[in-house]
Amino acid sequence: MRFAASIAVALPVIGAASAQGFPPPVEGVTVVKSKFDENVKITYKENDICETTEGVRSFTGHVHLPPDDNDFGVYRNYSINTFFWFFEAREDPKNAPLSIWLNGGPGSSSMIGLFQENGPCWINDDSKSTTNNTFSWNNKVNMLYIDQPNQVGFSYDELTNITYSTINDTVYVADFSNGVPAQNLSTLVGTGSSQNPWATANNTVNAARSIWHFAQVWFQEFPEHKPNNNKISIWTESYGGRYGPSFASYFQEQNEKIKNHTITEEGEMHILNLDTLGIINGCIDLMFQAESYAEFPYNNTYGITAYTKEKYDAIIHDIHRPDGCFDKLAKCREAAKEGDPHFYSNNATVNAICADASSSCDNYLMDPYQETNLGYYDIAHPLQDPFPPPFYKGFLSQSSVLSDMGSPVNFTQYAQAVGKSFHGVGDYARPDVRGFTGDIAYLLESGVKVALVYGDRDYICNWIGGEQVSLGLNYTGTAEFHRAGYADVKVNSSYVGGLVRQHGNFSFTRVFEAGHEVPGYQPETSLKIFERIMFNKDIATGELDIAQKPDYGTTGTESTFQVKNEIPPSPEPTCYLLSADGTCTQEQLKAIKEGTAVVENYIIKSPAASKGDPPPTTTTSPTAAPTAGSAMLQAPVAMLAISVLTALAFL
């Protein structure tokens, strides 16, 4: 697995707030000291930065946790300052349920989801103004976006001077004791976290422990959210295919310990009433999904033949051969079971075995795809992919925005420290205690709804692998889920947005013509799926009450592969300074480095880029089935780019 950083910089440094472009001092924040622990506090500020609907409130802030020498067995000698952005529901917030949103990475900010996928606003191409998102997920649900683990996005451990290279998308710790260096197109300065990989969670399970502490504080002590509805859901994406099952099952386990009085510490006995786990294009378990990295580029519903039969066979061989991907995964999991049963990642031998497994599988599965020059997050787009747009990075660089947010740090889309920490212990090769598919089964047995939603153009966590996960679960409803067929997802009177297999509380949905960030491609379809699940309706029509019909199952075909899609036109290239490594050509990067590029609102106007070649197809391109539809439902702005980098992070 490869990792990348991307920072939006308003150019602050510690002790240099008077310099032009630096965010002003944090002022006007409300401070709430915990009634349970004097060292714990919440700071927050109300604002209308993104949600401009009259009467609908939103708040940005941090939950501040001190170091802890025994965090459920984990020694944590660093502070955690976790950023949140809370949006009340546009309709009846007092009685609306609440959903947490988490992006993946590991190390990616949830501002990706907020601004590129499902939040109340889209950022326009001037990187300064917003457009209302009528398909926002806070239409009927209170939404809580969290940057986690520590050092991700606006979350931080300690304020640190940094420089940021737009050329290689990297953050460096800086010493400004002799003055702040001059800035140019390729080098920016700012304030961030320590960049210390030891000052953040080092695996998924430890991240679950941290987010549970955040939730205990926020749901008990954040004064602006006192609902009549105490249901909590988690929706997540990408590496969230691991976060979601692990976090939700950890919450559920802690609930059980609170109920049986195993946990009795004051301030840590709040029941988190779990309702739904939603996973969008999740990378859940390589044991189920590894083969899809060969299958999807070779045989997909768009007729794109990125791999030859020889390349496909070679990857499958590397997965199954002795000392191949599966062998290494099995050795890692056995070593972790014996040497790190509590998932502290403090056993150097286990860490080395699992890091080797993770790196080896990455090499076997993903290295061949680099040669295709196709998008990791959208196989129909070029590698330098200008969709969805990165304009929110410039937006979050504005001094006025940072002031309204009350943020002491610049925005960092990707936390390198988190990537290094997780990669160093081989987190992607490991399961948690039950395994992530076991977590999903446990949640279903506990009455929690689970929805797997996959856009059908994503390579990195593709729908073919996601479907294999859905069919590989072992729970009491397995046979009934397998017997269910695929039904159309009816979005409106004229559009079918995908196909869904559902039995009771469990579902798998393939969303047509969507890449990795499904709501950014198909806002209306995604909102319908989200709200139907959240309010106990069947996903196919939204007309049946699943709570009243727990044995409901969809009927239809056993497979969705017969429904083909047309390849969309390639997006217009847009080189964006704050996503240069993922959106710009080598010529443009050279001009940025030399300072000769012409830049307007962070967009490189000169030198211009030409549109990339279309993806390779089979001799006869498939025709779109009537149910697939070909009109992409997009935001009302020119949706352009998320970083798709040669150094890769799951979003």
Swiss-Prot record:
Residue segments, region Disordered: 607-627
Disulfide bond entries: C50-C121, C325-C361, C332-C354
SUPFAM superfamilies for the chain: alpha/beta-Hydrolases (SSF53474)
Enzyme class (EC, first level): hydrolase
Swiss-Prot/TrEMBL GO biological process terms: proteolysis
Catalytic activity: Preferential release of a C-terminal arginine or lysine residue
Signal sequence extent: 1-19
Membrane topology per record: Lipid-anchor; GPI-anchor
Residues carrying covalently attached carbohydrate according to the record: N77, N132, N161, N168, N184, N202, N260, N299, N347, N410, N474, N492, N505
Residues the entry annotates as binding substrate: C461, E517
Record propeptide residues: 630-651
Catalytic activity, EC: 3.4.16.6
Gene Ontology CC entries for this record: fungal-type vacuole; plasma membrane; side of membrane
Residues with a covalently attached lipid (GPI-anchor amidated glycine): G629
Main location class: membrane
Pfam families, per the entry: Peptidase_S10
Catalytic machinery residues: S238, D458, H516
Regions of compositional bias (Low complexity) in chain numbering: 618-627
Known function: Extracellular serine carboxypeptidase that contributes to pathogenicity.
Protein name: Carboxypeptidase S1 homolog A
Species name: Trichophyton tonsurans (Scalp ringworm fungus)
Lineage of the organism: Eukaryota, Fungi, Dikarya, Ascomycota, Pezizomycotina
